[in-house]
């Protein structure tokens, strides 16, 4: 099988897609990335993975595998405390001590 077919299989069968929403620092909430994460992870683990993949460490985060950037322009800040991740129909906010469900 070719790589594109295997990638599509992963996205449909093996992985979930979560949305990363920047709203910290007074930002108007806006989706900055869609991140592919393993389906078998707990929701908070999916949030952790999305957080890690949307932080620039050695390279710009939007160049990471499993990340689809959704922002306009040349760049975007890293995900921070106060930002959110949408997993299925549940939205989580990044707190200083983990993830809290947004009601």
Regions flagged by a language model, labelled:
Residues 1-64:
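N-terminal non-globular leader segments, chiefly Sec-dependent signal peptides
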Residues 64-75:
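Short alpha-helix capping/helix-loop boundary micro-motifs
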Residues 75-103:
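Short, compact, well-ordered microdomains
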């Amino acid at each position: 099988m070719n790589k594109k077919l295997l990638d599509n299989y992963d996205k449909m069968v093996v992985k979930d897609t979560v949305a990363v929403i920047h709203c910290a620092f007074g930002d108007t909430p806006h989706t900055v990335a869609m991140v592919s994460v393993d389906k078998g992870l707990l929701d908070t683990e999916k949030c952790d993975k999305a957080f890690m993949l949307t932080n620039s460490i050695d390279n710009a985060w939007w160049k990471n595998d499993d990340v689809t950037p959704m922002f306009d322009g040349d760049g975007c800040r890293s995900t921070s405390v106060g930002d959110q991740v949408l997993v299925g129909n549940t939205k989580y906010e990044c707190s200083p001590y983990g993830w809290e469900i947004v009601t």
